[in-house]
Amino acid sequence: MVIIMVFGNIGQDKSIEILKIPKDRVGVLIGKKGNVKKTIEKELGVKLEIDADGTVTIYGTDKQKDPLAVWKARDIVRAIGRGFNPEIALKLVSDEYVLEVIDIEDYASSDNSIRRLKGRVIGKEGKSRRYIESLTGANVSVYGNTVAIVGEHEPVQIAKEAVEMLLRGASHAKTYKFLERERQKIKRARFELWKKKSDVDELYEKMNPNYEEIEIEEDEDEIEDEE
């Protein structure tokens, strides 16, 4: 279980957050010769203090350019603590990526129930987890009593809903159909966005055959010529 303590702002835009990760994930967070810790600090301009018991303290510094740097570092640490490898966790540096953590205990009534539900999410030989990942593009980690998801906003929400469907007892077939429908919606939405952009580009090219070689000017003469 991850414990997070927020100490607000200290000085100007310098926050401190303290959280705890499993002891067996401390080595992964530090990395070989401290490379993972150093990468997080360099990418976000923060400082990490990592104790052997799994307590991690994150400090904002004068080097951070992103006002959300401490929060992003917190989510990266949480993701590693929830079983993700550093390469995936570091995607959370981007504003486009988010982390969701689902507590299996919220859906279980006993230890046996927790094991059964974990098995449903993972699937035989990992099939269910891989299917969720392949249809959403998000990354899924089942670790301890949690399911964690990293990815772009919309895919993460779809993957989260699929995981919660399985935890609530929906069949794998029903869950997979849901994922297929949502994937088709995303593909259609992206196609429409691409089509609109292509239409605009094509129209502009017809209006300005050499538009890549000229500067865009919007004086009155040019507007009249275009009309």
Curated annotation (Swiss-Prot):
Pfam families noted in UniProt: KH_1, KH_KRR1_2nd
Protein's recorded name: KH domain-containing protein MJ0443
Describe the location of the KH domain by residue ranges.
14-77, 106-163
Q: PROSITE patterns, from UniProt?
A: KH_TYPE_1
Question: By its UniProt entry, which CDD domains does this protein fall under?
Answer: KH-I_Dim2p_like_rpt1, KH-I_Dim2p_like_rpt2
User: A GO molecular function for this record?
Assistant: RNA binding
Q: Which SUPFAM superfamilies match?
A: Eukaryotic type KH-domain (KH-domain type I)
Q: Which residues form a coiled coil?
A: none
Which Gene3D superfamilies does the entry mention?
K Homology domain, type 1 (3.30.1370.10)
Q: Which UniProt keywords apply?
A: Repeat, RNA-binding
Q: Which domain of life is it from?
A: Archaea
**Entries under InterPro entries matching the protein:** KH_dom, KH_dom_type_1, KH_dom_type_1_sf, KH_domain_protein_archaea, KRR1-like_KH2
Q: Does the keyword RNA-binding apply?
A: yes
